[in-house]
Amino acid sequence: MFKKAVKDHSAAAARPLQSTIPNSSGVASTKLPPPQSIGVKRKIELTSTKSTLGSLHSAVYFDENDFDDDDDLDFESPDPYIPPARIEKDSFREESFHAAKSNSTLSHKADSQSAVTVSKTNYESDIKYPDLPPVPPDDNPGPSSSALPWSSSPPSHFQKPAAPRTVPWRKQENNIITIDDEAKPETPARPAATAPWNKTASAIKEEQKELRRQNKKAQAQKTQSSTKHHMPRAQVAPIFLSQKHVLKAVVEKGQSIFFTGSAGTGKSVLMREIIKKLRDKYRKEPDRIAVTASTGLAACNIEGVTLHSFAGIGLGKEPVPELVKKIKKNQKARNRWLRTKVLVIDEVSMVDGDLFDKLEEIARLIRNNGRPFGGIQLVVTGDFFQLPPVPEGHNREAKFSFAAASWNTSIQHTILLTHVFRQRDPEFADMLNEMRLGKLSPRTIQAFKELSRPLDFHDALEATELFPTRAEVDNANSARMARLSGETMTFNAVDSGTIQDIQFREKLLSNCMAPQTIHLKKGSQVMLIKNMEDTLVNGSIGRVVAFMDEATFDFYVENENDFASGKFDEGDEDRAARARKKIKGMGHRDGGVTVTRKWPLVCFIQPDGTERHLLCQPESWKIELPNGEVQAQRQQVPLILAWALSIHKAQGQTLQRVKVDLGKVFEKGQAYVALSRATSKAGLQVLRFDPRKVMVHPKVIEFYRNLVHASDLIKSKQPPKPQRTISNGDEDVYIDELIAEAEAY
């Protein structure tokens, strides 16, 4: 039995191994299987002379030197899988053949060749794979969404899947998360180290000023919130809508304009805005703009020069040829005429008509230009119903500028401003307009007579009394000063300028609002003559409550209640004294005014009834030429005594409390100027009202009948009027309609 088993085993070993592999039908096949994996070597002996066990041993034996070659251990990355349906049988056989050939060893070359021969001849299998029917190529393929002919899926399965739904709250949540993700965290800046012991005196002073500014702002907001239900809210705009048309015509279109209006229509505000815009326009050539006025007072208010000073004609009484020779000898005056492109004239109502004609002819001769005013653009303003020009001779009647022969050719448009800002009461504004025209109704006369009652206010301020002459003003103020007790403080102005002649310089500055010398006492009623802040403007009335330096004022602001009640601690007084001593040591030692000088502390009453304290320190007033040369300059505290004021100096001012005695009025327009300074009937007292004192020149009434509103500048064009013909031929906007007297006022 043992021999039979060995014999059977030997016969099985002599038979090829491939013959034992069953086929798909369950019958053992004699064909070779697919070759082994790459890198695995196996010895296959088809014929053997050894014993059966030896043949088995040699069939599975691995020599120790078979793996000495490193190439046998390098496994290559497999190729990407290719579907079997697309692989041809012949190619697969060739690849298998090459793989088997590369894995054979060199030591058994003959045996390997015989094995390959057998595998190549016996690889054909009995398995029959089904062949798919051939598909002809389609030249016109249908859309990707169409159903395939060989597929059972509906066409909807081949469409692009719909986007997933998103609920609203999920979308909102995603947005919030996205915003948080995009926000980049920032490391907070390290706060600057504050060392109170390591600050300079100037830094401490700036901090104190900032603290005072914040406290004042908070108090103002508190006052406004407490009074907003009792006081009407005033909305004051720098430039009103109708005034913007004038500003555009002057700055953008370069037209020569004369704009006028009753008292309180914003002529001064509009003129300042025009000057500002023109200087911005010619900022590279500042000497192209000449800012002038008919009087020194008006010139100081707009920081310009008088018209006579600009022209270089002195009094201007000589004939034009002599004046031209005089100007040509003065190189500066000649250059001013040649360089000027825009000439601004304020308060033209006091410019004589003959002088206007002389200036127009001088401009044409000096500039050698035949156009009106030698091609210079004119910006003129004033109210001819107010103070008239002063005639040269006593027997000669005053001649207004609009009566000059060159007025109509030099001025392209004459504009009337009708919106009144100063008087918020329509009834009071109508009363003033009737007085302006010289046509008083019985009702208006009775209303003015009822204003003779005394003014009663619950504070220490009195109404400012207006007088026609300067002597009356000085007498009234001196009498009131004599009634006050206490020390008199004198403040002298510091004058300077390019004019070395002291007398001539003082003559120029004599018309300035700031006096050369002013005497004040505690309790003096004063008026502010400089715009300081929004609520403290030119014309604000106040009372002097103390005299102190800047250091004391800082201490006063912090302890205002203690100052009022007279309660002080010795420590507080010592602290204030040390502060004054420290600042005094830092003062200038060059002979100028030191910071320890005491200045008047004034308590101003604002329109809403609140108080405002201001330490009035020196301000500057300049008389400046177009080229920037300052002919004269005055530094003085911005205050004047305000118990009494001249009508001439009051022109252009806005006063909350006014007292007028019309029995002393002697000139046309004086009554209207005096009464129109008031803002309401509650702050106006009129003594000895006489309708015969209300005098208006008939030529002025005739002139104002043919004026156009400012808004008509942007309306449609009409054929030009003879008196409004534009000499330079430029296309422009013409007057649309004539405004009747009743409609204008």
From Swiss-Prot:
Its EC number is 5.6.2.3. The keyword Nucleus applies. Belongs to the helicase family. PIF1 subfamily. Coiled coil: none annotated. It comes from the Eukaryota. It catalyses: Couples ATP hydrolysis with the unwinding of duplex DNA at the replication fork by translocating in the 5'-3' direction. This creates two antiparallel DNA single strands (ssDNA). The leading ssDNA polymer is the template for DNA polymerase III holoenzyme which synthesizes a continuous strand; ATP + H2O = ADP + phosphate + H(+). Its cofactor is Mg(2+). Residues 141-156 have a biased composition (Low complexity). ATP binds at residues 261-268. This is ATP-dependent DNA helicase PIF1. It is found in: Nucleus; Mitochondrion. Residues 131-140 have a biased composition (Pro residues). Residues 1-39, 96-173, 180-199, 208-231 are annotated as: Disordered. It is an enzyme of class 5 (isomerase). Pfam families: PIF1, Pif1_2B_dom. GO terms for molecular function: 5'-3' DNA helicase activity; ATP binding; ATP hydrolysis activity; single-stranded DNA binding. Keywords: ATP-binding, DNA damage, DNA recombination, DNA repair, DNA-binding, Helicase, Hydrolase, Isomerase, Mitochondrion, Nucleotide-binding, Nucleus. One of its GO terms (cellular component) is mitochondrion. One of its GO terms (biological process) is DNA repair.
